[in-house]
């Protein structure tokens, strides 16, 4: 659930307003609060007047950024597996995606394969960190390697950092824009959706130097006009939450992760242990019938045991048919019920033999 302070404020705003169009780039008090929050965690200031725009979720921020930085025919590097919207957004802009595989279980990448992609003279690299769907948190050294390539080949970095506060013990989120030479060529796209449990509020944003932000704002203006003014007003209190909120938030997700992955281990279902986010990639190889697709398996699983999953083929450029994505951002009773249902998987969807 969202923080009570935000829902209480939303109730007040529903009576008192604002209810009219905000300024296109976002309400001033919301942008100022967002700038303060980003400075607190990133250690660098983004000017709320010239380097920040409020969007309809991070999805719009990504679309606006891709259109602002590229021309039709340009190439964009992205890692596979990837959030499925990225490919569509890239193609929609008339660009060509260039995929670099992340290799499970740790989802590392081959530096030489990555540089081969940069040798194709892309306009940008698009990175989700922490990563949906793999749960990978890129290390400082990995980001430094990518940053060095961006500088050497004059490439922009488009960062999707919506899971920045869902990182588990032993891992640390590093903002690409904080690396040497990267602030001037990085666009950070994020949202309030995950951090404050308000996915339906659709409050996102982009951070970028002014020369890039001026172009992003133009696309934003003609795409959506502006974010909802009542929701921005209600969310200001959330952006000023004390550090204790983020500590409790992280502990809560660590609890959900332990509950769900612990149950998966007991059931003997192979999966990758996420370093961040709330996703688990499970290996369904033992359950696939000959010729059955992961899509068909997900339909069968939903029908026979009542657990929903996303087919892994949605996220890979490679021919991958044996992985599904599950998520654990649910209440304990829901996760326990899902695990109880998954316990009947071998009975209701017998392993191939």
Which residues does each predicted region cover?
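Active-site phosphate-binding strand-loop segment of PLP-dependent enzymes
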Residues: 102-169
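Conserved PLP-binding catalytic core of the aspartate aminotransferase-like
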Residues: 253-254, 267-304
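N-terminal small-domain helix-loop-helix segment of the aminotransferase-like
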Residues: 1-57, 64, 240-241, 348-353
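A short helix-loop-beta submotif of the ANL/AMP-binding
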Residues: 92-98
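PLP-dependent aminotransferase class I/II
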Residues: 1-3, 185-276
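Helix C-cap/helix->beta junction micro-motif
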Residues: 93, 152-153, 267, 305, ...
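PLP-dependent enzyme catalytic core of the Aspartate aminotransferase-like
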Residues: 116, 290-291, 300-309, 315-353
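Conserved PLP-anchoring active-site segment centered on the Schiff-base-forming lysine
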Residues: 68-90
């Amino acid at each position: 659930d969202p923080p009570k302070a935000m829902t209480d404020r939303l109730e007040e705003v529903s009576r008192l307003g604002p209810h009219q169009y905000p300024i296109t780039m976002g309400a001033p008090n919301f942008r100022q609060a967002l700038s303060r929050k980003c400075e607190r965690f990133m250690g660098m200031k983004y000017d709320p007047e010239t380097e920040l725009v409020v969007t309809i979720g991070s999805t719009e921020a990504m679309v606006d950024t891709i259109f602002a930085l590229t021309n039709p025919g340009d190439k964009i590097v992205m890692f596979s597996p990837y959030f499925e919207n990225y490919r569509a957004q890239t193609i929609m802009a008339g660009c060509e995606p260039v995929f670099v595989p992340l290799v499970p279980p740790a989802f590392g990448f081959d530096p030489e394969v990555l540089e081969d992609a940069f040798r194709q003279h892309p306009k940008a690299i698009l990175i989700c960190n922490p990563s949906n769907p793999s749960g990978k948190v890129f290390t400082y050294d990995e980001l430094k390697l990518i940053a060095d390539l961006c500088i050497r080949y004059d490439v922009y970095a488009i960062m999707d950092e919506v899971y920045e506060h869902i990182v588990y013990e032993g891992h640390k989120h590093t903002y690409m824009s904080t690396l040497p030479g990267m602030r001037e060529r990085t666009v950070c796209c994020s949202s309030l959706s995950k951090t404050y449990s308000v996915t339906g509020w659709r409050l996102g944003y982009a951070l970028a130097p002014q020369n890039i932000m001026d172009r992003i704002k133009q696309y934003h203006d003609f795409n959506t006009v502006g974010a909802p003014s009542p929701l921005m007003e209600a969310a200001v209190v959330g952006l000023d939450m004390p550090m204790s909120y983020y500590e409790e938030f992280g502990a809560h997700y660590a609890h959900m992760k332990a509950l769900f992955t612990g149950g998966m281990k007991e059931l003997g279902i192979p999966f990758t242990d996420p370093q961040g986010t709330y996703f688990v990639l499970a290996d369904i190889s033992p359950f696939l019938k000959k010729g059955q697709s992961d899509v068909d398996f997900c339909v069968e699983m939903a029908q026979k045991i009542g657990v929903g999953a996303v087919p892994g083929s949605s996220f890979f450029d490679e021919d991958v048919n044996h992985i599904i994505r599950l998520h654990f951002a649910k209440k304990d009773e829901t996760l326990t019920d899902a695990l109880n249902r998954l316990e009947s998987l071998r009975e209701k969807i017998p392993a191939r033999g």
